[in-house]
Amino acid sequence: MGTQGSPVKSYDYLLKFLLVGDSDVGKGEILESLQDGAAESPYAYSNGIDYKTTTILLDGRRVKLELWDTSGQGRFCTIFRSYSRGAQGILLVYDITNRWSFDGIDRWIKEIDEHAPGVPRILVGNRLHLAFKRQVPTEQARAYAEKNCMTFFEVSPLCNFNVIESFTELSRIVLMRHGMEKIWRPNRVFSLQDLCCRAIVSCTPVHLIDKLPLPVTIKSHLKSFSMANGMNAVMMHGRSYSLASGAGGSGSKGNSLKRSKSIRPPQSPPQNCSRSNCKIS
């Protein structure tokens, strides 16, 4: 007969994220692309609010995310002010095919600075699968994100591209901000999952992980593991650069793609050897 007790949690950390942006930028599409988790709000009154939970893997830890879409209509700004309390991360979403939605990000940043100051945020350009209708250049959005100290992603829920990666990166930023990263990193014993990830990532460039015959969730975890541990290479503008290489000129880019050769120290005969022919040829 089993004894009743507190239920075992299916996650290690619980984070609350808000998706904000103008209406019709596809925030609901992002939530709908997440296959796991519940879609029912834990609160009785949630008019104008879309809610979903999902669980991601971050360095072998399970992070449960509560995702709230506060809608983008002006009358919901007051709702945003209420739901921003306790938020630990914010995704600023715009539509890359709608210039007006990108220009509206300034207004949302002002709302965040007023009602949720200091909360980590990232900039997300949605509907990358409609790039042929693009109105917001990638470089302009990236420069805007850097100016406002934000990480930048372009995502496509339809193609399942960069959605999980954006949530994973924001989770990492939040946990590092709160010092959680230090809890599990020092003196940890590597799990079997960590060892398998380390073995795969050590011999596979990060831009080739998507081509491995593995489930999407595992490939996403492998990329997250690679970035977190500074292993292998990262992709920048379609080219692979070694994480160990410095920010040098164009000459260093070519060298960064070459494998470093192992250099062995020169061998010499033992000094106390009495044989006259003790030499290394």
From Swiss-Prot:
Q: Ranges for the SOCS box domain?
A: 175-228
Q: Where does it primarily localize?
A: membrane
The UniProt entry's GO biological process terms, in alphabetical order, are: intracellular signal transduction; protein ubiquitination
Query: What residue spans carry the region label Switch-II?
Result: 72-88
Binding residues for GTP: S23, G26, K27, S46, G72, N126, R127
Residue numbers spanned by region Switch-I: 41-49
Similarity comment text for this entry: Belongs to the small GTPase superfamily. Rab family.
- What domain notes does the record hold? Switch I, switch II and the interswitch regions are characteristic of Rab GTPases and mediate the interactions with Rab downstream effectors. The switch regions undergo conformational changes upon nucleotide binding which drive interaction with specific sets of effector proteins, with most effectors only binding to GTP-bound Rab.
Cofactor(s) required for function per UniProt: Mg(2+)
Which reaction(s) does its UniProt entry say it catalyses?
Answer: GTP + H2O = GDP + phosphate + H(+)
Protein's name in the database? Ras-related protein Rab-40C
Residue ranges, compositional bias (Polar residues): 270-281
Q: What is its EC number?
A: 3.6.5.2
How does the entry describe its membrane topology? Lipid-anchor
Supply the source organism for this entry.
Mus musculus
Fetch the Pfam families from UniProt.
Answer: Ras, SOCS_box
Q: Does the keyword Zinc-finger feature in the UniProt annotation?
A: no
Q: Which InterPro entries match?
A: P-loop_NTPase (IPR027417), Small_GTP-bd (IPR005225), Small_GTPase (IPR001806), Small_GTPase_Rab (IPR050305), SOCS_box (IPR001496), SOCS_box-like_dom_sf (IPR036036)
The cross-references to SMART domains, in alphabetical order and at most eight, read:
RAB (SM00175), RAN (SM00176), RAS (SM00173), RHO (SM00174), SOCS (SM00253), SOCS_box (SM00969)
Instruction: Region Disordered: list its residue ranges.
Output: 245-281
What does the activity regulation annotation say? Regulated by guanine nucleotide exchange factors (GEFs) which promote the exchange of bound GDP for free GTP. Regulated by GTPase activating proteins (GAPs) including DAB2IP, which increase the GTP hydrolysis activity. Inhibited by GDP dissociation inhibitors (GDIs).
| Recorded metabolic or biological pathway in which this protein acts | Protein modification; protein ubiquitination
Complex and partners? Component of the cullin-5-RING E3 ubiquitin-protein ligase complex (ECS(RAB40C) complex) composed of CUL5, Elongin BC (ELOB and ELOC), RNF7/RBX2 and RAB40C. Interacts with protein phosphatase 6 (PP6) complex components ANKRD28, ANKRD52, PPP6C, PP6R1 and PP6R2; the interaction leads to ANKRD28 ubiquitination and decreased PP6 activity. Interacts with DAB2IP; DAB2IP acts as a GAP for RAB40C.
Q: Where is the lipid attached (S-geranylgeranyl cysteine)?
A: C278
Q: Which residues bind Mg(2+)?
A: S46, D69
Q: What does this protein do?
A: RAB40C small GTPase acts as substrate-recognition component of the ECS(RAB40C) E3 ubiquitin ligase complex which mediates the ubiquitination and subsequent proteasomal degradation of target proteins. The Rab40 subfamily belongs to the Rab family that are key regulators of intracellular membrane trafficking, from the formation of transport vesicles to their fusion with membranes.
